[in-house]
């Protein structure tokens, strides 16, 4: 059990260019850029899970094996099954309908049905995914934010879904599903993401 004073905020703007939907041949279309980015190789923002504003806030975070408790901006002490398309979904709030966070199932479909390649675009390392349609998207390795520190930028990619973690029963109330990849080629969807970490976000739509 631990008690922390965490400053929760996005380091980059929540505003984003008009998203272009890329049809990879999957169940949803994926945006060509991260939330907060202007180009595919831009990192965009690093956002806390269930923060619909992306703005700065000081929150007393009581974080242990069975709950997640913070101010109401970050979901509070509630049993949330998922936030895709809800008022806690920053994509829906910033980009409008029909854009939203991907679900765990949609993120898993992305990494299992697409060809994956480690590449650099304009000096930015990341993951290129080629779908069954032959079209591609690029996920830059934006690292993650812990409190005020940005870690492993250019080395790892961390991308939120809107799905609450279920695999770890002891942590199910304060973990969420996310995509992780690194320079060694390791790629997985994990439900071990701490919600107060700042991760990248790639919007989706039907």
Region spans (language model):
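C-terminal, surface-exposed recognition/capping segments
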Residues: 22-206
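Bacterial Sec-dependent N-terminal signal peptides
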Residues: 1-19
């Amino acid at each position: 059990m631990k008690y922390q004073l965490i400053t929760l905020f996005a380091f980059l703007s929540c505003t984003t260019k008009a998203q272009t939907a890329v049809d990879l041949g999957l169940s949803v279309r994926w945006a060509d850029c991260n939330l907060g980015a202007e180009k595919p190789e831009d990192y965009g923002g690093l956002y806390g899970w269930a923060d619909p504003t992306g703005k700065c806030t000081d929150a007393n975070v009581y974080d242990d094996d069975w709950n997640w408790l913070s101010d109401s901006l970050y979901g509070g002490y509630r049993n949330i099954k998922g936030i895709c398309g809800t008022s806690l979904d920053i994509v829906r709030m910033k980009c409008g309908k029909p854009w939203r966070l991907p679900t765990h199932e949609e993120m898993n479909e992305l990494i299992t049905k697409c060809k994956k390649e480690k590449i650099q675009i304009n000096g930015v390392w990341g993951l290129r995914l080629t779908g069954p349609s032959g079209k591609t998207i690029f996920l830059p390795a934006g690292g993650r934010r812990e409190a005020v520190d940005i870690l492993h930028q250019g080395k790892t990619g961390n991308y939120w879904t809107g799905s609450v973690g279920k695999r770890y029963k002891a942590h199910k109330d304060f973990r969420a599903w996310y995509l992780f990849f690194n320079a060694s080629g390791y790629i997985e969807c994990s439900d071990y993401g701490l919600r107060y970490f700042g991760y990248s976000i790639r919007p989706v739509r039907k």
